[in-house]
């Protein structure tokens, strides 16, 4: 290649020497980091607040966060958001909660218009009123409104809700034969979630896609 040879040096030769650890996997790497942190704290050489872990992309934090949480090591993400608190991750988790429990109205409310489906606030207010009057979940209320000939919803609203209902029922059926991982992939692709992010064509959207692939 055309890369120039480099010789790295420092004027400050005090302190610990750099240690290179070649991990077998991402999880092995995260465990090594956690082991080193616990060793430093146990030896009273450092406090947790003295330790920093640098990584190249936000998506790389997931496995490290999991290991730190499992070890009971408290941490703070600087200049970013914890993996499971990122919008795209919360969206997919809400989809999965809804798929495994269609009567989870809270999760349904989060994903009903994600990606954008053109389901407006007025439409959802009517669906919520139906759910309250019938004493049922939002999903059952949507089904009732779509199938009712006396629905107060506009034909357009019934159409977009019907499309959502079709997608939701397909995903609910798929859960019988799919692992959670495969189902999550189907959610991202089948609902158009990834396609919407790709259409944004921004650095932020690319980062979100990378997080989802993680």
Question: Residues of each region from the PLM?
Answer:
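Proline- and acidic/polar-enriched loop/turn elements at helix boundaries
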Residues: 9, 52-53, 79-80, 143, ...
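Structured beta->alpha junctions
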Residues: 22, 57, 81, 115-116
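Short, surface-exposed, polar/charged, turn-prone segments marking secondary-structure boundaries
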Residues: 7-11, 80-83, 103-106
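Conserved RecA-like helicase motor-core motifs
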Residues: 72-82
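Helicase P-loop NTPase motor core
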Residues: 1-74, 97-101, 133, 158
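Conserved helicase C-terminal RecA-like lobe
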Residues: 47, 61-73, 86, 93-214
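Pocket-edge positions in alpha/beta enzyme catalytic cores
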Residues: 10, 21-25, 81-84, 156, ...
């Amino acid at each position: 290649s055309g890369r120039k040879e480099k010789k790295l040096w420092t004027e400050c030769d005090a302190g610990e020497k750099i240690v290179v650890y070649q991990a077998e996997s991402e999880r092995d790497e995260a465990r090594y980091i956690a082991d080193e942190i616990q060793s430093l704290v146990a030896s009273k050489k450092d406090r947790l607040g003295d330790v920093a872990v640098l990584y190249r992309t936000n998506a790389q934090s997931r496995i490290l966060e999991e290991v730190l949480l499992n070890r009971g090591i408290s941490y703070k993400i600087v200049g970013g958001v914890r993996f499971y608190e990122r919008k795209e991750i919360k969206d997919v988790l809400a989809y999965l909660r809804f798929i495994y429990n269609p009567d989870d109205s809270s999760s349904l409310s989060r994903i009903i218009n994600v990606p954008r489906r053109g389901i407006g606030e007025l439409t959802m207010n009517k669906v919520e009123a139906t759910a309250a009057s019938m004493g049922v979940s939002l999903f059952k209320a949507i089904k009732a409104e779509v199938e009712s000939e006396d629905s107060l919803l506009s034909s357009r609203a019934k159409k977009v809700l019907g499309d959502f209902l079709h997608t939701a029922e397909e995903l609910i059926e798929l859960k019988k034969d799919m692992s959670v991982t495969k189902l999550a992939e189907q959610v991202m692709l089948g609902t158009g979630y990834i396609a919407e992010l790709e259409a944004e064509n921004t650095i932020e959207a690319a980062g979100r896609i990378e997080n989802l692939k993680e």
